[in-house]
Amino acid sequence: MKFFLIAAHIFFLTAQNAFSQNFDKGFAAYMLGNYSQAIIEWRHKASSGSATAMSNLGNMYEVGAGVEQDKVLAHQWYNLAASNGDVVARKNKQDLEENMTMSQISNALILAKKCMISGYSDCD
């Protein structure tokens, strides 16, 4: 039993380390201005359910860093991040909605639902 607990703990630490390394790669790429690489890294983490990565993707789409500026996709990512507990994303989504039409918001909600149903694999 003790061996199992130690193995489980090592697995948890390894998985946690791998998770943070990928996130750090995204942040490092962003800080270097390599936005397309940051998006690749954060999309990978978002597909695993990372609210922070989802929020970062929302920001990228909102400002058009490395992607074409797109309020609908920004809202989608902020909504997904907020649904996963990111309070900053919730605020960003509310602020963004002030500059969106009802049709855009509706489309963003449809996309977010589709993304969630797909297990975060069909999100763009």
Spans of features found by a protein language model:
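Consensus positions within tandem repeat domains that build extended binding/scaffold surfaces
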Residues: 42, 50, 55-65, 71, ...
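Terminal, low-structured helical/coil segments at or just beyond the last alpha-helical repeat
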Residues: 90-124
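Short coil/turn and helix-start
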Residues: 31-35, 47-48, 61-69, 83, ...
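Sec/Tat signal peptide C-region and signal peptidase I cleavage site
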Residues: 16-20
